Amino acid sequence: MKRIAIIGECMIELNGAPFRTMQQAYGGDSLNTAIYMARTAGQSIEIDYVSALGVDTISEGMISRWKLEGINTDYVLRDPTRQPGLYLIQLDEQGERTFLYWRNQSAARYLLQHPGFPNVEHHLANVDMVYLSGISLAILPPTDRQKLINLLHNIKAKGVEIAFDSNYRPALWDTKLEAQACYKQILTLTDLALVTDDDEECLWGDSSQQDTLHRLRNHGVRNVILKQGAKGCLYTDFTTDIPELIATTPIDTVIDTTSAGDSFNAGFLAGYLTNKTPREAALQGHQLAGIVIQHKGAIVPRSATESINFNKEIK
């Protein structure tokens, strides 16, 4: 059985008008991927979520729900002095979303300073793959960010594959140059890059897919998935000059794209780690994302994703 460790932060989500009725949930890019991957892979892959929460009742409830999804929470550290981060989603009259965040003192931000983190370090050296995103890095204090990159360098030398989703969020970085410097370091360690054309344009000013692929190749990335929204994605391992376009099936009714990229990553990684071809893995990601975007919220009901049979051959 393959084993993947997913590093990141899950936050409490409030959705609604201030001082009126609000819906309470939780979400975060890495956690979304972990959940959808657990649903996709079943018992064929062990999925470890690596993060930190408090010892409060909300933290307890979150962990209980993750266990029900089939995620191993042994490496979610508990911080008695901090709690989960919080974000509020507000909708305007046109249905556009705006976000307010309270995360600077979250337990996950100080994950690497937790006294239990050396045990996590030891564990990460013994998994098959570590997956993280630009958000996983952005939330950390700069010294901890560098410590994590150094750790990834050490475990890569021991044979652990590194998968990275760029997931660039400008508001989480002091400057664009700071983000670029960090991404350059992580990309030199990356075996599998899962990037999005919009993010690459925003961070690097890429004007074409060739710009993106050329830059990633120069950083030494071995495998690249370039997500292109409704068009599908491109895959290359740089053994040929032309990347493979893997189209997705158009969705007539799109309700919420919050977890489109996260769920695609989950489906792709589940296929990748169970020895499916890149095309098969990407089609699996497209199928899963296509279901997710037809429902509201970052984490859709299990009944929705159970409608996909990932054990049959994908044509």
Predicted segments — roles?
Residues 2, 205, 209-315:
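Conserved phosphate-binding/catalytic region of the ribokinase-like
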Residues 1-17:
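Positively charged, low-complexity intrinsically disordered leader regions
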